Amino acid sequence: RFAEILLIYAEATFELQGKKLTQTQVDYSINRLRDRVNMHRMNLDELSAWGMDLETELRRERRIELAGEGTRYADVMRWREGELRFGRAITGPSLKVCMNDLGANPYPDTGVDEFGDVIYEKSTAEGGARYFDATKHYLWPVPNPERQKNPLLGQNPGWEK
């Protein structure tokens, strides 16, 4: 999709120019995405004045624009941020239906109270710790059928067993 092409352009240009973009390049890429939804335009002078890192902002822009489209894992691998992003427990909101003292949901039909407020119990539960091994997980294993076709073909580090 066109939005992803603009994001790729911004990221590639940023990398090729030594971690720099001009305002014209930001306008051509990121701000075209923001303009279509009437969002505040990215301004390099504002980012600098606010002490914000352009690389972080470009990556955040990509994460938001492509949310739910299955690109996050490949992005994190390309940026070599696996340890940071995948080496910790998954956290996030967890909503549970509110129950009264009798163990029944007092608002079973709508989930809202008489004032129209959504009722839920806050949960601080976390998922289990995730495991990420930088010596292994940045590469995929070479498939066994390919190794059987060519016995001289080795295996990527960490996947030998």
Predicted regions: what they are:
Residues 1-161:
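Acidic/polar-rich alpha-helix caps and helix-coil junctions
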